[in-house]
């Protein structure tokens, strides 16, 4: 392979990689309206979309760069948060947070359900964990040195 081909391949790979900007967890929920209300009213998210118009069963809620997708399936398909499968799998989503302190205070005032209040955890992360209306646990943390 020539140097030109290698450089072109690397450039193509870098261009492709730079297209990845975010990931959104997709949570199965029991009651879509109740789940949307929890994220909007308690956690300050905005409803980005829902559909389809004739039979709404999915939605996306967003706050800044964090987006969570919600979907109701059928009455017999219930939410299955990670912690229900094993105690070590306690997070369903991790949101990098530049400054968790004011967010923690806001959530506390809004009546959000906390799994773990603002603190350092053993791997040096500073932040907190919340539980949504369907039992999913979302972690809001930053590294000890202040970086996300």
Please place each PLM-identified region on the residue numbering.
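Vicinal oxygen chelate
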Residues: 2-26, 46-96, 104-131, 142-148
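Conserved active-site tyrosine of GNAT-family acetyltransferases
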Residues: 35-40, 107, 135
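Short glycine-/small-residue motifs
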Residues: 137-140
